[in-house]
Design a protein with these regions (language model features):
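Short glycine-dipeptide loop
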Residues: 242-248
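Class I (Rossmann-like) S-adenosyl-L-methionine-dependent methyltransferase catalytic domain
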Residues: 1-142, 157-163, 167, 174-191, ...
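A short acidic, Gly/Pro-enriched loop at the edge of an enzyme's catalytic core
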Residues: 207-216
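A short, conserved alpha-helix within the catalytic core of class I
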Residues: 225-237
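A short beta-strand submotif of the Rossmann-like class I SAM-dependent methyltransferase core
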Residues: 218-221
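A structural alpha-helix within SAM-dependent methyltransferase catalytic domains
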Residues: 162-165, 235-239
Length: 348
């Protein structure tokens, strides 16, 4: 009897496990998983689905997982190629029984649509109330503001463009989002400001831009760039449109501590408004053009030190975002990336 006891206990457990599997298969399951489209994290999507499906009693075999992987791979590639504001939505349902049905679909906004959604769903001010301290300091270098023309690319709600125009600078704005453009245009018209608004992608043409700007600025715009080629096009535009001695200022995320940006970080960063470039990509982008780097500052440190009293941080999310914490949720001093203010001067 003693020798047969372990076998009897094992048999009891087998029967219990079989009953539990049947119990799980009597569940009726419906669910949806929505995640940013990051193709290089394909394994994470497969693993998440595998765990969830198994937890509701529909464990996939190797063949089923391989098929799921292929479906996810194709949808991820499509979604990410269309927009860096894209999601993968995995809808699943299981009737009574062992079968689980699923669908994988891509959903996306254009960048302009994403920001228009901000207008309808978020309380203003969307980006803060004060102009960037770095931009304001450069504008203050002007001997005569009337001759110090400014081009603000991706001006948003006009946080920089409107104060610069009030200060007396002639300002041109190129804005991709129609609702943002209308906000700026309406305010400029009401105040009688010397401010022109152009609604389009800035890289479509330079025909309607001047070639004598003293300052070209992009605040919180370059993180939406998708490739080093766009960075190169920005430098080419600046070289063509700045007057000699004029300056280009923009902020972008750059690595720290020798961090090497991989595809997963680059893709997820773009989904989190945190597109990043390497120092080498920056150097390659400006190579051969009459532009020299004259300033390179931490956005966090510069803005914290130089914004008016009470204006730091500009928004509740700003300090963490410029520190890279929307991608790497670690202590700020340990983040492998940070947003930097870069200033380039046209040499000839």
């Amino acid at each position: 009897v003693e020798n047969s006891l372990p076998a009897a206990v094992d048999q009891q457990q087998e029967w219990k496990d079989a009953m539990t599997r049947r119990f799980h298969s009597r569940s009726v399951v419906t669910g949806e998983i929505s995640l940013p489209a990051v193709p290089s994290l394909l394994d994470e999507y497969v693993e998440m689905c595998s765990r969830i499906f198994a937890a509701v009693g529909r464990k996939f075999n190797d063949e089923e997982l391989a098929h799921l992987r292929t479906v996810l791979q194709n949808q991820l590639a499509e979604a990410y190629s269309i927009s860096q504001r894209s999601n993968i939505v995995i809808s699943y349902n299981a009737p009574v029984g062992p079968t689980l049905h699923y669908q994988v679909n891509a959903r996306w906004f254009t960048v302009a649509e994403a920001y228009e959604n901000w207008i309808s769903t978020r309380e203003p001010p969307l980006f803060g109330t004060e102009p960037d301290a770095r931009v304001w300091a450069l504008a203050n270098e002007a001997a005569d503001v009337r001759d110090h023309r400014v081009l603000d690319i991706g001006a948003g709600t006009g946080r920089n463009a409107l104060p610069l125009a009030r200060r007396g600078h002639p300002v041109d704005v190129v804005e991709l989002t129609p609702k943002f453009a209308e906000i700026i245009r309406t305010q400029a018209r009401q105040e009688g400001l010397d401010l022109r608004v152009i609604v389009r992608n800035v890289f479509e043409t330079t025909d309607d831009l001047r070639q004598d700007y003293q300052l070209i600025l992009l605040s919180e715009v370059v993180p939406d760039f998708r490739s080093p080629q766009q960075l190169r096009r920005l430098f080419e535009l600046a070289a063509a449109c700045l007057a000699p001695g004029g300056q280009l200022v923009f902020n972008t995320f750059l690595p720290r501590y020798g961090y090497e940006i991989d595809d997963a970080a680059r893709e997820f960063g773009q989904q989190a408004y945190t597109g990043m470039f390497s120092r080498q990509e920056l150097a390659t982008g400006v190579e051969g053009l009459p532009l020299e780097l004259v300033a390179d500052d931490s956005v966090y440190e510069y803005e914290q030190a130089n914004l008016p009293s009470g204006a730091w941080p500009p928004t509740s999310w700003y300090a963490d975002w410029v520190s890279g914490l929307d991608v790497f949720p670690v202590a700020r001093e340990q983040s492998p990336i940070e947003m930097r203010w870069l200033v380039f001067r046209k040499t000839r």
